[in-house]
Swiss-Prot record:
May be involved in transcriptional regulation. May play a role in spermatogenesis. There is a cross-link at residues 109, 400 (Glycyl lysine isopeptide (Lys-Gly) (interchain with G-Cter in SUMO2)). InterPro entries: Ikaros_C2H2-ZF, KRAB, KRAB_dom_sf, Znf_C2H2_sf, Znf_C2H2_type. SUPFAM superfamilies: beta-beta-alpha zinc fingers (SSF57667), KRAB domain (Kruppel-associated box) (SSF109640). It comes from Homo sapiens (Human). The keyword Repeat applies. Keywords: DNA-binding, Isopeptide bond, Metal-binding, Nucleus, Repeat, Transcription, Transcription regulation, Ubl conjugation, Zinc, Zinc-finger. This is Zinc finger protein 331. SMART domains: KRAB, ZnF_C2H2. GO terms for cellular component: nucleus. It comes from the Eukaryota. One of its GO terms (biological process) is regulation of DNA-templated transcription.
Length: 463
């Protein structure tokens, strides 16, 4: 007998019941293909070994190996059956000046306990999370998971796209990325016709139509369509933020957010719009920006029919109908529909203005205001009126301008029924009914109900 047996379990990948249930048929087929490739690699080993043994595989053994592989390759697509591997691979044996292998694999078919039960190639007895990363202490239940995780620390990205030279840590990421260049979207939703590059994206998308939210938080009961959304949400309860920026110390709950954040320091904007040349830190921002040019608004409110360019805009809008304001300020008790609004509001109390203009040094309490301000320096006016061609720095300015052409006056006075195209015009008008005069002259104390009236009055003193 040869010493130091290499069992098939050393290269096999096992799935738990829960993990297997999450795989679609294409992913399960991929699993079988990978496992069979491993079988083939083991059979065809021709490596040097310190072990010498004169026993050779017989022709009958080799025939059994090849026949078994062909048989399993043909029949493994049946997910209603389980296949187990019995036998071991001995280390390469030396004989007649070359190295050969001795391996007998017998596939045994047995009925599955239920449809979709994961194949168990070998029952392992590792303790849960027994593979620990020496860099950050994070633990994993399987060795291959640790190997994949360590690439985050080393920065290793061995899989490079030939089209754009972008590199990836894992081969499946490259495969998915390449569909961007080919434009391939083979997975189509039967309800709305929207197509996707990946089957998993279609499964998640279908939950929009069905309303299914299978991932529920045990702490607060909130449910989510996707597992990663639940994982991210749970970090709000635990306060866990594993990924820290070495430049500024800011921490993040997800690694991709850290990667995007680092581009703020480096100035890198790899995603460029082909229509106007504007570049972005992340790809999702480019996709959303393109809708300015196309006019696409794919997210529609079922209550009022209003459509939006982003799904988070729709989610925020829907709170108007429900009246939900779950985010409350601990300082003053003011409540907000959205968490981001609360964060911005809290800066009023703290005086924090973290967003600084590199041109003039002016600081702002939210990034959106800085983005708008920077257009003053660049002269960029991305919002153009289709009627007259006039362009604006801000989208809100375009919306107000378009009312000149449409004649829309959405702000109506409840006292007299008079309508206005702008909210501030209604506010000023309502002072006529209330008698409020909020603009007072510092010279003589006279009060006016409109700011422009006060300015006209002040000319008397200046003259």
């Amino acid at each position: 007998m040869a010493q130091g047996l290499v069992t098939f379990a050393d290269v096999a990948i096992d799935f738990s019941q829960e993990e297997w249930a999450c795989l679609n048929s294409a992913q399960r087929d991929l699993y079988w293909d990978v496992m069979l490739e491993n079988y083939s690699n083991l059979v065809s080993l021709d490596l040097e070994s310190a072990y010498e043994n004169k026993s050779l595989p017989t022709e009958k053994n080799i025939h059994e190996i090849r026949a078994s592989k062909r048989n399993s390759d043909r029949r493994s697509k049946s997910l209603g059956r389980n296949w187990i591997c019995e036998g071991t691979l001995e280390r390469p044996q030396r004989s007649r000046g070359r190295y050969v292998n001795q391996m007998i694999i017998n596939y045994v078919k047995r009925p599955a306990t239920r449809e979709g039960t994961p194949p168990r190639t070998h029952q392992r007895h590792h303790k849960e999370n027994s593979f620990e990363c020496k860099d950050c202490g994070k633990a994993f239940s399987r060795g291959y998971q640790l190997s994949q995780h360590q690439k985050i620390h080393t920065g290793e990205k061995p899989y490079e796209c030939k089209e754009c030279k972008k590199a990836f840590r894992w081969g499946n990421q490259l495969t998915q990325h390449q569909k961007i260049h080919t434009g391939e979207k083979p997975y189509e939703c039967k309800d709305c016709g929207k197509a996707f590059r990946w089957g998993s994206s279609l499964v998640i998308h279908k939950r929009i139509h069905t309303g299914e939210k299978p991932y529920e938080c045990k702490d607060c009961g909130k449910a989510f369509r996707r597992g990663d959304e639940l994982t991210q949400h749970q970090r709000f309860h635990t306060g866990e933020k594993d990924y820290e920026c070495k430049d500024c110390g800011k921490t993040f709950s997800r690694v991709y957010k850290l990667i995007q954040h680092k581009r703020i320091h480096s100035g890198e904007k790899p995603y460029e719009c082909k229509d106007c040349g504007k570049a972005f830190i992340c790809g999702s921002s480019l996709i959303q920006h393109k809708r300015i040019h196309t006019g696409e608004k794919p997210y529609e409110c079922q209550e009022c029919g209003k459509a939006f360019t982003r799904v988070n805009y729709l989610t925020q809008h829907q709170k108007i109908h429900t009246g939900e304001k779950p985010h409350e300020c601990k300082e003053c008790g003011k409540a907000f529909r959205w968490g981001s609004s609360l964060v911005k509001h809290e800066r009023i109390h703290t005086g924090e203005k973290p967003y600084k203009c590199t041109e003039c040094g002016k600081a702002f309490n939210c990034g959106y205001h800085l983005t708008q301000h920077e257009r003053i320096h660049t002269g960029e006016t991305p919002y153009k009126c289709k009627e007259c061609g006039k362009a604006f720095i801000y989208g809100s300015s375009l919306v107000k301008h378009e009312r000149i052409h449409t004649g829309v006056k959405p702000y109506g006075c409840t006292e007299c029924g008079k309508s206005f195209s702008h909210g501030h015009q209604l506010t000023q008008h309502q002072k006529t009914h209330s008698g409020a005069k909020s603009y007072e002259c510092k010279e003589c104390g006279k009060a006016c109900n409109h700011l422009n009236h006060l300015r006209e009055h002040q000319r008397i003193h200046n003259s």
